[in-house]
Regions:
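Short alpha-helical transmembrane interface motifs in multi-pass membrane proteins
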Residues: 9-11, 36, 73
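Short alpha-helical "patches" and their helix-cap loops
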Residues: 89-91, 98, 102
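Intrinsically disordered or compositionally simple regulatory linkers and C-terminal tails
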Residues: 1-20, 125
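Long, amphipathic alpha-helical coiled-coil segments characteristic
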Residues: 21-70, 77, 100-122
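Two-component transmitter module helix at the DHp-CA junction of histidine kinases
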Residues: 92-95, 119, 123
Length: 125
């Protein structure tokens, strides 16, 4: 007789690394109609807003889903799709009442990568 192993408890897989650039410059150019000054303004606004929203999210967890939703829209607007995807995952889990420690970390990392890409882009403009 062989003993059957007990099935392991379900554990969520870590999020996959997004494919493509951190900042989709083609999308950004379409959204800003090719106007470099508008692009600069939008990128600077997103950089500030994303840092502020992340800080607020950590201090005000009850507002987390709304903050994540706001960040998701802003990120999509500039072509920071990894940030948008991370914010979407966080928003969904918060609305379901699920733990979000890993999702907050993924979002913070995505924002950090986007900030670096924005800094690089602003220097190139």
């Amino acid at each position: 007789m062989s003993a059957l192993a007990k099935p392991a408890d379900w554990v969520d897989s870590p999020p996959l690394a997004p494919e493509g650039p951190v900042l989709d410059l083609d999308h950004l150019e379409r959204m800003t109609l090719g106007e470099r000054e508008l692009e600069r303004e939008v990128l600077m606004l997103f950089a500030q807003q994303s840092a502020d929203l992340l800080a607020r999210l950590e201090k005000l967890p009850r507002e987390g889903a709304s903050l994540a939703h706001t960040l998701k829209g802003s990120a999509r607007g500039i072509g920071a799709f990894a940030v948008a995807d991370a914010a979407d995952d966080l928003e969904r889990r918060l609305r379901q009442g699920l733990p979000v420690t890993a999702e907050v970390a993924v979002l913070a990392q995505a924002i950090g990568s986007a900030q670096a890409a924005i800094d690089e882009r602003l220097q190139a403009l």
